[in-house]
Amino acid sequence: MARILVVEDDLWSRRLVFELLVLRGHDVLCAAGVGDGRAQLDSVKFDAVLLDINIPGGGGEVLLREIREYNSVMPVIAFTASAMAGDRERFLAEGFTGHISKPIDVKSFGETVEGYLVASP
């Protein structure tokens, strides 16, 4: 079981991801934007973060940079509808551990997230 932070501004996406991960036995907390995510990260130790790119408060890249200042190894997964050619490579170059495109495949989503957890040091 991992403790996972989901930073996603869309309520329905947040609920879906929360339910899918909880059903797999994970402890999941959610935040709706950069400020909420920062507050959660300041008060709880997480094993991974699912981070939407287009969120209030500056965007996912802003929060990623803050996370990487103190934790270079925790999996931070870009969770976004941005699926244009080159997006995955750009996210990896920015410091994300991986990329999951929306809409998600509910059958494989949990396994995909867990793959990033297993691959982390």
Regions found by a protein language model. Name each.
Residues 104-113:
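C-terminal output helix
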